[in-house]
Amino acid sequence: MYDDSYVPGFEDSEAGSADSYTSRPSLDSDVSLEEDRESARREVESQAQQQLERAKHKPVAFAVRTNVSYCGVLDEECPVQGSGVNFEAKDFLHIKEKYSNDWWIGRLVKEGGDIAFIPSPQRLESIRLKQEQKARRSGNPSSLSDIGSRRSPPPSLAKQKQKQAEHIPPYDVVPSMRPVVLVGPSLKGYEVTDMMQKALFDFLKHRFDGRISITRVTADLSLAKRSVLNNPGKRTIIERSSARSSIAEVQSEIERIFELAKSLQLVVLDADTINHPAQLAKTSLAPIIVFVKVSSPKVLQRLIRSRGKSQMKHLTVQMMAYDKLVQCPPESFDVILDENQLEDACEHLAEYLEVYWRATHHPAPGPGLLGPPSAIPGLQNQQLLGERGEEHSPLERDSLMPSDEASESSRQAWTGSSQRSSRHLEEDYADAYHDLYQPHRQHTSGLPSANGHDPQDRLLAQDSEHNHNERNWQRNRPWPKDSY
């Protein structure tokens, strides 16, 4: 009687209870698995934090100059959240060691810059590809530099920019200390320019005693371009056309400068052949260009005339060189010494180099430097020195002239420019250089700043040269105190 009776919902509820009972172990397993993952993540992050702390006491392995912008705060894959570096294009990074294929450990070269995780070239390339895929899906197949712009360029222009961007590596390997190069007021090899620059060399030698290497370079460093060093065809042509210095000699000098910079001392080059910033613009040296400027062509003419007939014979060529320098936009130089007094110019330069010294020297002790950049995988293809031939043992050749020799005449060359007023000089040399002298070229551009982009869309963005110039250069003073 009771066997045939049916209680509605009995089997269903019983089956449901069984299902609930059997599903509990699965839920518990998922929770346990999630806890294991979280525990493993915390362990990995703890180890990464410890390695970050240990890196503070390690020496600098090598340095790079950035060609892209990157915001580490927005990168969720950083080994330690909040410990990623932020940098803009044309910034400089000191690399301490390799953490993984995607991450390095180092610091941004600036005062107070702390040790942080730096994306490797492979990591930046991965981010770039993801952004390109995202842009294509959104129907805007533009290059990274076009992200955030108001209007998309024509397809042909966009493809051209994208093709150009693909050939630009995210980093360029540069010396650990940017070498200082003096140019101006005119051509090297003539008395006025040589005496004024020698006065600065003597000052730097004494002011930074124990922290500076001043070395003479006779090879033509303008030949040290990546396109030349990595192209055997161009190398052969230049070796035929250049009687003064071969590519092998230039490459040897570049390696020697890199070697000098490993000590993290200030490196000053007395480069015979460098008279214009454009000569070093495409090299791997990333130099600090110091323009020794005479404010008026009339003053320079008077200084040249005061050196006698032997210098007067070359007045025209010296004035033409001066004219080319003063026409350069201010951002072509890192420091412009336009003071009338030697003491003021020396203090100006010393102030800049003191700030740079503090920017490059992290408070943590560093016993020295590691091997060359090629010791870290992934950098061989980005070396700016080209394929190495025979190994040359780098020699630190300090070719300073005796510090007291001709010091008085050097001082007179500086002070002579302020002996007479501009009014008297105009009267003496009216129209003497009127046809040759050209005023400064105005350097303007309407490109928007990369900082105006939405931070969610600019984890990695190609920066324009003008944006960097606007950020790092102040027109009122040739050298801003906050450059580093």
Curated annotation (Swiss-Prot):
Its main location: cytoplasm. GO terms for biological process: calcium ion transmembrane transport via high voltage-gated calcium channel; calcium ion transport; chemical synaptic transmission; positive regulation of high voltage-gated calcium channel activity. Keywords: Calcium, Calcium channel, Calcium transport, Cytoplasm, Ion channel, Ion transport, Phosphoprotein, SH3 domain, Transport, Voltage-gated channel. The keyword Hydrolase does not apply. It comes from the Eukaryota. Residues 1-52, 129-170, 387-484 are annotated as: Disordered. PROSITE patterns: SH3 (PS50002). SMART domains: GuKc (SM00072). Disulfide bonds: none annotated. One of its GO terms (cellular component) is cytoplasm. The keyword Phosphoprotein applies. Residues 195-345 are annotated as: Mediates interaction with the alpha subunit. It is found in: Cytoplasm. The modification Phosphoserine is found at S152, S393. InterPro entries: CAB1-4_N_A-dom, CACNB3_SH3, GK/Ca_channel_bsu, P-loop_NTPase, SH3-like_dom_sf, SH3_domain, VDCC_L_b3su, VDCC_L_bsu. PANTHER family: VOLTAGE-DEPENDENT CALCIUM CHANNEL BETA SUBUNIT. Belongs to the calcium channel beta subunit family. Regulatory subunit of the voltage-gated calcium channel that gives rise to L-type calcium currents. Increases CACNA1B peak calcium current and shifts the voltage dependencies of channel activation and inactivation. Increases CACNA1C peak calcium current and shifts the voltage dependencies of channel activation and inactivation. This is Voltage-dependent L-type calcium channel subunit beta-3. The lineage of its organism: Eukaryota, Metazoa, Chordata, Craniata, Vertebrata.
